C-alpha cells in the first residue's frame, strides 16, 4: 500500500503524547511558515486546520486565544517561539529530538490514512505544494507585466 503523507502531520506525530495543541511550523522564508495545528489527546491527533502558508502574525493569532497547552514542532518552531511564543500562555518549544519529522511520524500518519482507505498507487502520488516557488512567482509576475505592457 502507498499513500501521500503531509510533512506537517508527520512532524505532529513526534508530539502525539503531548496533551494539547501541536503547532507545526516549517520555515517558508519571507516571514512566513508552512503551518498546521492538531489536537493531541491520548496518543492520537485530530487535525484542526489544513496545511497552509501563513505569516508569523497569522500564526500568533491562531494560537493566542487557545486556552489549551501548546507545543511547537518543526524547523520553523524556534522562529515562531522567538517571535511570539514567549508571549502566549501555555506555549512551549518541543525538545530538539522531538522537533523535526522522522520516519516514525511518517509511518504513523500513513497508518491513519490507510485505516481511512486513503491509499493509492505509487504512480498516483503527487506533491502538494502550499505556494508557488520563487521562480514560478517571478515568472508569473514577468508574464503579468509583459501582458500589461502589450495591452497598454
What are these regions, as identified by a protein language model?
Residues 94-152:
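Acyltransferase
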Residues 1-101, 129, 134:
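Surface "functional belts" at beta-alpha junctions
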Amino acid at each position: 500500500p502507498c499513500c501521500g503523507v503531509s510533512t506537517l502531520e508527520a512532524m505532529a506525530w513526534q508530539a502525539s503524547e503531548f496533551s494539547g495543541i501541536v503547532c507545526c511550523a516549517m520555515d517558508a522564508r519571507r516571514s512566513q511558515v508552512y503551518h498546521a495545528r492538531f489536537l493531541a489527546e491520548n496518543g492520537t491527533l485530530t487535525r484542526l486546520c489544513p496545511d497552509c502558508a501563513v505569516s508569523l502574525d497569522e500564526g500568533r493569532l491562531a494560537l493566542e486565544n487557545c486556552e489549551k497547552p501548546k507545543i511547537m514542532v518543526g524547523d520553523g518552531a524556534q522562529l515562531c517561539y522567538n517571535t511570539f511564543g514567549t508571549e502566549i500562555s501555555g506555549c512551549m518549544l518541543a525538545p530538539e529530538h522531538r522537533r523535526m519529522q522522522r520516519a516514525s511520524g511518517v509511518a504513523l500518519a500513513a497508518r491513519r490514512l490507510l485505516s481511512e482507505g486513503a491509499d493509492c498507487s505509487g504512480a498516483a502520488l503527487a506533491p502538494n505544494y502550499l505556494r508557488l516557488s520563487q521562480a514560478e512567482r517571478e515568472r508569473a509576475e514577468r508574464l503579468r507585466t509583459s501582458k500589461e505592457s502589450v495591452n497598454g
